């Protein structure tokens, strides 16, 4: 029996498969054209530990490929996929199937499209603003193209899984969405994918990438393009001066010789303080200006704008004379500042007092992914 999960249930298992070493995701395995997913007891046996109980009050989201296949069960919320099934439309969950049952989840493009549709409905009901919905979808796209995964059961305040395999690059996501058809939410998913920066290692990095790359009307600051989590090429002759053979700045502008790194709670113990000192020495030895940021720089739009101004000042010597004027106009734009406030609220909501993730990377609003 083949089981193809849909919607929120698919996203739950997708996240668990990314973060659980016992599970995996296989690409290039075509989803079945026919499914017989009506045996709930058998389905429950292959769902990962921690998945919610199945029942009529909490129906399981399942995909079927014809209207005839849809079961009339109170415990199943059936989604019909009638458009062509392309490669990587669905991913096989390895390590979960047993007794002849294969478990599939939606791939990144379909996941993003279905979330876009859910958020559109929420906006229509008045439970969410259009701006908040946009940034929530941006956050999910960044996660899908990044190396972190939010807690599937508690994405709002649960800990993230770090250093997980990338599901897809931003270009791959855009390509997959361009080929998708007949899927609700795909238009908004394409819009978001056209703006997302791939490669973020935490929600905090995703937020900073958005702040430094989005158009001004969406809350961004007009900074030059950056490299994101790419290995630094040491200047010629620098290897005898540095402590590290390689380094990977969070954000780096090679032409400007400027790097930006986020120092979260993980950097506060003595061992990591020494490591940070060595990294700062390496940057200085190579004449690279390092800007560091911490949680306080993301407490408010004003704090974020202060950080963006510092970064811009480091970049300014290699830019045109009017560069800082454009930056200041963006930073002082009240509409753009309001956008940045919403960005912060959706990607880094307030945590319980005294609680901070290992990398200061709290998850987004629970309703974003539940």
Positions of PLM-derived features:
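Short gly/ser-rich loop at a beta-strand->alpha-helix junction or flexible surface loop bordering the NTP-binding
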Residues: 1-185, 322-323, 330-370
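Surface segments flanking catalytic/ligand-binding clefts of nucleic-acid enzymes
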Residues: 162-370
């Amino acid at each position: 029996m083949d089981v193809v999960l849909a919607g929120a249930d698919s996203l739950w298992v997708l996240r668990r498969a990314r973060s659980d070493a016992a599970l995996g995701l296989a690409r290039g395995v075509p989803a079945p054209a026919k499914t017989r997913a009506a045996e709930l007891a058998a389905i429950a046996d292959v769902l990962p530990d921690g998945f919610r109980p199945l029942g009529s009050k909490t129906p399981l989201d399942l995909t079927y490929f014809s209207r005839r296949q849809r079961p009339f069960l109170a415990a199943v919320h059936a989604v019909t996929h009638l458009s062509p099934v392309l490669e990587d439309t669905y991913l096989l969950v390895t390590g979960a199937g047993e007794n002849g049952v294969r478990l599939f989840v939606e791939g990144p493009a379909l996941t993003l499209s279905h979330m876009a549709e859910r958020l559109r409905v929420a906006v229509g009901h008045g439970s969410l603003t259009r701006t908040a919905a946009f940034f929530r979808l941006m956050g999910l796209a960044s996660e899908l193209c990044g190396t972190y995964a939010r807690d599937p059961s508690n994405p709002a305040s649960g800990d993230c899984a770090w250093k997980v395999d990338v599901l897809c690059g931003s270009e791959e996501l855009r390509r997959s969405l361009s080929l998708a058809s007949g899927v609700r939410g795909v238009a908004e998913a394409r819009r978001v994918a056209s703006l997302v920066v791939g490669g973020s290692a935490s929600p905090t990095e995703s937020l900073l990438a958005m702040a430094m790359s989005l158009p001004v009307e969406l809350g961004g600051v007009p900074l030059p393009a950056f490299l994101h989590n790419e290995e630094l090429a040491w200047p010629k002759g620098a290897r005898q001066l540095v402590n590290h053979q390689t380094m990977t700045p969070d954000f780096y502008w090679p032409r400007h010789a400027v790097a930006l790194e986020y120092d979260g709670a993980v950097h506060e113990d003595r061992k990591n303080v020494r490591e940070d000192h060595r990294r700062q020495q390496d940057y200085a030895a190579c004449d690279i200006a390092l800007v560091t940021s911490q949680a306080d720089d993301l407490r408010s739009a004003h704090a974020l704008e202060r950080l963006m101004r510092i970064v811009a000042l480091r970049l300014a010597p290699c830019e045109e004379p009017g560069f800082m004027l454009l930056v200041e106009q963006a930073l002082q734009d009240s509409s753009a500042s309001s956008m940045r406030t919403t960005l912060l609220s959706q990607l880094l909501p307030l945590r319980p007092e005294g609680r901070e993730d290992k990398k200061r990377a709290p998850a987004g609003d629970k309703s974003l992914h539940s």
